[in-house]
Each structure stands twice: as C-alpha cells, then as structure tokens.
Amino acid sequence: MLLEAEFWVAVAFFIFMGIAWKVGAFSAMTKGLDGRANRVRHELDEAKRLREEAAAVLADYKRRRAEAEKEAEAIVAGAREEAERAAEEGHRKLDDFLARRTKAAETKIAQAEAQAEAQVRAAAAEAAVKVSETILRERMQGDAAQNLIRASLGEVRTRMRS
C-alpha cells in the first residue's frame, strides 16, 4: 500500500491542500470568487435597471404617440369643422348676394317698366293733344278759337302729366 501511486498522489494532494490552507490561498480564492459574484450581481442589477428604464422610455413614447395621434385627430376634426363652416358661410353669402342682385334687377326692371309706361303715356298725351289741336283748328276759326284751343290744350297737358 505504501508503494502504490494512488496512495502517494493522495498524500501529495493533502499536503498541497494543507500548505495552501496555511498560506491563505483558500481565502484569496474565496475573495476572488466573492468579488466575481458581486460584479456579476452588480451587472445583473444594472441590466435590470436599464431594462426597467427602457420599458419606462418605451411606455412614455407610446403615451406621447397616443397623445400626438389624438391631438392630430382633434386638429383634423377642427379643420374639417372649420372648412364646413366656411363652406356654409360661403353658400349663405352667395345666396344673399344672389338675392340682392335679383332684387336689384327686379327693381331696375320695375323702374324701366314705370319709365316706359310714363313715356308711353306722355307720348299718348302728346299725340292726343296734337290730334285735338288739329281737329279744333280745322273746325274753329278766329282769335277766340285760338285762345280756347291754347287754354284747353294747356289744361289737357297738365292733367295728362299728373
């Protein structure tokens, strides 16, 4: 048993472990492993924090995007309503303008009719006066007849014009 290699390997292993324990190699290895574990834990915490921050930024982006979409929809709806109001106002103004123009045209037509009627009456009165004057001159003679004709014609003209 003392000559077997396994025995001497085991003895060398235990001697090496004893020396390593005496020198403090186990505490150095433990400190190294603990430091590495702390670094990994810190990196995991940092990754978790960054992930939460990214999630918050994403949520904020989604919220802002939704608000912007709502605002854009409100702006479009407002513009659409304003355009409809402007179109209605334009139609109303056009209708008012056409009504005023129609009324003005009707007024001008009525004035033209009244003027034409007055001119026809005046022409008819003038013609009647001339015909009456001609008839009276042919039938009546003398100064008295001329004075009577002038007075009568003046009276006829006055009555026809009024």
Curated annotation (Swiss-Prot):
InterPro entries given in the database record: ATP_synth_b/b'su_bac/chlpt, ATP_synthase_B_chain
Keywords from the named record: ATP synthesis, Cell inner membrane, Cell membrane, CF(0), Hydrogen ion transport, Ion transport, Membrane, Transmembrane, Transmembrane helix, Transport
Subcellular location: Cell inner membrane
Membrane topology: Single-pass membrane protein
Pfam families: ATP-synt_B
Residues passing through the membrane, by range: 1-21
GO cellular component, one term: plasma membrane
An example molecular function term from Gene Ontology annotations: proton-transporting ATPase activity, rotational mechanism
Keyword Transmembrane helix belongs to the record: yes
Top-level taxon in the UniProt lineage: Bacteria
Subunit field text: F-type ATPases have 2 components, F(1) - the catalytic core - and F(0) - the membrane proton channel. F(1) has five subunits: alpha(3), beta(3), gamma(1), delta(1), epsilon(1). F(0) has three main subunits: a(1), b(2) and c(10-14). The alpha and beta chains form an alternating ring which encloses part of the gamma chain. F(1) is attached to F(0) by a central stalk formed by the gamma and epsilon chains, while a peripheral stalk is formed by the delta and b chains.
Family: Belongs to the ATPase B chain family.
Role summary: F(1)F(0) ATP synthase produces ATP from ADP in the presence of a proton or sodium gradient. F-type ATPases consist of two structural domains, F(1) containing the extramembraneous catalytic core and F(0) containing the membrane proton channel, linked together by a central stalk and a peripheral stalk. During catalysis, ATP synthesis in the catalytic domain of F(1) is coupled via a rotary mechanism of the central stalk subunits to proton translocation. Component of the F(0) channel, it forms part of the peripheral stalk, linking F(1) to F(0).
Record protein name field: ATP synthase subunit 1
Native source species: Methylobacterium radiotolerans (strain ATCC 27329 / DSM 1819 / JCM 2831 / NBRC 15690 / NCIMB 10815 / 0-1)
Gene that encodes the chain: atpF1
